[in-house]
Amino acid sequence: MSQPDPMLRPEPLESDGEDRALRPQRLEDFVGQAEARANLRVFIESARMRGKAMDHTLFHGPPGLGKTTLAQIMARELGVNFKMTSGPVLARAGDLAAILTNLEARDVLFIDEIHRMNPAVEEILYPAMEDFELDLVIGEGPAARTVRIELQPFTLVGATTRLGLLTTPLRDRFGIPTRLQFYTIEELDLIVTRGARLMGIPSEPEGTREIARRARGTPRIAGRLLRRVVDFALVEGDGRLTRKIADSALTRLGVDHLGLDTADRRYLTLMAEHYGGGPVGVETLSAALSESRDSIEEVIEPYLMQQGLVSRTPRGRMLARLGWRHLGLDAPRTQESLFDE
């Protein structure tokens, strides 16, 4: 069975720690997300001019697009402390209370995977976000009492890959919802070029662009591919990042010209050969591929849909015309008529 290549998955890996030195430190150094950056610049400057905590911010979109980096930049530009945690870690109300009561005025608290937060923990977050107050229940049974604790004004930055899983009360408390989009090849090229320069590796424009083309529109993946290509350039090349060494390295790693790996191609091939291009339900695909539904919906499908290889319909997933073309196959006549409508 073909397993997804971890290198081409947008979730963080332990080896990604090497990328921290390559991350932009200021908003002006951040490449891509032009609309989000422009708006954040206004909100940050306004908060600084007023001397107030910036409004609560929610970053949503596919993984690996820079949510954590933007949150860190926000704190740095605001000149405040940055505290980071994640939804699954906050198992009890006391866990969140301990963090909130230690925040200083205007600090930024970043909660990754906020959609996975315990509902009981989420409940105490509401008054904290709205009124900067914390209501804690002390004791049990008839002796239980509620204690209200005043908090310092702070900025909560939430990050999620599944906006639809956020409850409406929580989602509505974020004054600055911001969707992050996949990056263009040109933007990724700038990121790869900057990364190669910071690594001290000479690069040719065609070499960095080849990596950018295969990075699935995701900076995190671009950074991983860059490191692997540099390995090949140092060991099997002359130390320069050229198109030839990039193409050779990525091909050997199983990354095709669109950035698809064996798991992606298996998904497309399954739809074409076993289900005639669809429509087919996600549960059926999950069973056939031995992949969890979440993995298919959060990791595999977003990029395939963004590239126009797969479409989602009320009746299920369908292989699009470009998907058939990528496999080198002709679409069935029944599907061709749908494409032509």
From Swiss-Prot:
Chain residue ranges for the region called Head domain (RuvB-H): 257-341
Molecular function GO labels: ATP binding; ATP hydrolysis activity; four-way junction DNA binding; four-way junction helicase activity
Region feature Large ATPase domain (RuvB-L), mapped onto this chain: 4-183
UniProt GO BP: DNA recombination; DNA repair
Enzyme class of the recorded protein, top EC level: hydrolase
Chain sites annotated for binding Mg(2+): T68
Subcellular localization(s) per the UniProt record: Cytoplasm
Signal peptide: none
Source species, domain of life: Bacteria
Residues reported to bind DNA: R293, R312, R317
Positions of region (Small ATPAse domain (RuvB-S)): 184-254
Binding residue positions for ATP: L22, R23, G64, K67, T68, T69, E130, D131, F132, R173, Y183, R220
Keywords: ATP-binding, Cytoplasm, DNA damage, DNA recombination, DNA repair, DNA-binding, Hydrolase, Nucleotide-binding
Pfam families: AAA_lid_4, RuvB_C, RuvB_N
EC number: 3.6.4.-
Region (Disordered): 1-21
Catalytic function, reaction form: ATP + H2O = ADP + phosphate + H(+)
Family, as annotated: Belongs to the RuvB family.
Record text about domains: Has 3 domains, the large (RuvB-L) and small ATPase (RuvB-S) domains and the C-terminal head (RuvB-H) domain. The head domain binds DNA, while the ATPase domains jointly bind ATP, ADP or are empty depending on the state of the subunit in the translocation cycle. During a single DNA translocation step the structure of each domain remains the same, but their relative positions change.
Protein role: The RuvA-RuvB-RuvC complex processes Holliday junction (HJ) DNA during genetic recombination and DNA repair, while the RuvA-RuvB complex plays an important role in the rescue of blocked DNA replication forks via replication fork reversal (RFR). RuvA specifically binds to HJ cruciform DNA, conferring on it an open structure. The RuvB hexamer acts as an ATP-dependent pump, pulling dsDNA into and through the RuvAB complex. RuvB forms 2 homohexamers on either side of HJ DNA bound by 1 or 2 RuvA tetramers; 4 subunits per hexamer contact DNA at a time.
Name of the protein in question: Holliday junction branch migration complex subunit RuvB
Primary gene name: ruvB
